[in-house]
Swiss-Prot record:
Primary location class: cytoplasm
Group of enzyme by EC: hydrolase
A UniProt-annotated Pfam family: Amidase
Enzyme Commission code: 3.5.1.4
PANTHER family attached to this UniProt entry: AMIDASE-RELATED, AMIDASE-RELATED-RELATED
SUPFAM superfamilies the UniProt entry points to: Amidase signature (AS) enzymes
The keyword DNA-binding appears for this protein: no
Protein name: Putative amidase PB8B6.03
Amino acid sequence: MDTPTWEVVAALKRNQVLNSIPKEWRKPNIRKEMISSGYVNTYEYLNLILPPEENAITNLSMLELATNIAKGNYTSYNVTKAFCHRAALAHQILNCCIEIFFDEALKKAKELDDVFQKTSKVVGPFHGIPISLKDQVDLPGKDSSIGYVSLVGKPKTEIALLAKILQDKGAIFYVKTTVPMAMMAPQTVSNLHGYTYNALNINLSSGGSSGGEGALLGSGASCCGIGTDIGGSIRIPSCFQGLYALKPSTGRISYLNVTNSYSGQELIPSVIGPMARSLKDIEFFTETVIASEAWKIDSKLLPIPWKNQSHLKSKKLIFGVLKTDGIVKPHPPIIRALNEVVAVLEKSGYEVIEISIPFQKDMLDTVVKVFSADARFEINNESQKTGEPVVSVVKRFVSDKIFKKPITVNEWWDLGNQVYKIRQMFLELWNNTAIQTLSGNSIDAIIAPIWASTSFLPESKADHLYTSLFNICDCPCVVFPFTKVDANIDLSDVSYKPLNEEDKENNDMYDPVLFDNMPVCLQVVTKKLEEEKCLAAASSIMDCLTN
């Protein structure tokens, strides 16, 4: 019997995903109907066509849902069904799911309802809460194909420790979401699933590599999801969909039994964290997970208990703002957001200073070398198993041109020394901000862009990273939405003279009409392992904005 071609395997997988949706929820023309109705925003369109009683559920935050379930106002079954229905439609518009298992989710919801009915108690803080998972988070009996055709039909036997922690506390899993090939790209495209579009504007990219997660959350079809981040993969999709998110430092949240590219590459390790529509949900998730003391099971975790930093919300923290990295200037709405956040903080009595990163180019060069150290051997090898081509966006991010062949151990050690040098330079830069501040103390946190645009057209050559400095330096980052693009205000700067070709490409890409109404998100960054402080800093910023 002939081995099926990669095209056949990919087509069968896509059909399998669609066939996992109940017949009454299959709408093959829904994307066309949405466009013909004049909508580009999937969240708004789904609110229009779905039952009001389901919207009432899916528009709540995770904490609000948990409270309502614990009070008996909603059953786990009704909550799960509402999110499954919305996810089914969102996938058919955005192409954001790679595994769908609604039947299992609804069965689990019924079991939780039975427990609640008998005991009048919830099994844990996530009782009855549907949580979506990035494809790489292992579940028994489910593929973790991470964008490769070769990994289809090879289900996992173990459950990721993080998933087990959530499940034991009452969470319900119902989908796994799309990723780019090898999860090494800032947009979500693979030969396996195709392209994943932006939930708030289907003409644009959802970002990557947690792009399926970002799209699902942005459409309102998830209240909380799990992403991973090695160069911006949690932050970029969260930014493009107006979400909150946490990229933690290494060693705070378990990566055990999470499938990964370049497993064992520890110079710039991937981390795992929550994405949600509420900052309080991010805080709730992180505190609950860290309180589970998973370091007793996962040897890579650091035994650092959760430290309540709520007192910092009343302290006047000192912020440093990074407006540009000196290589690619962010688009006008992002510059406006940075100026406005400074004004808002200063009006509320916070000290804000401007900072710059003089070694940004060296840092980016080092990141690319780390990611390309095997001369793309792993990706080429996995792709060649089925003959599928390496997708172009991954080729740009993981080069086979920098090194002709995988580098030697000695060259890897040299790279390790370069990473250490950059971390030291960054720490010294941070500590030296004390010279600039009125108090003589160094800054508490940095506010920076996440990307130089609020999204981009699918398949665009948009590759410049504002995120990777904080990966190489292992800093926690919190994403928060600050404003939206306003085509009447955020006009193109026709007098701007680009600094280089990459800057010119980014500048030429800007179209205020195309990006109108897109969210403008920023990231707040603290020193390594200061997740609690980072969340408190984000909360302080949001309080200033609200007030």
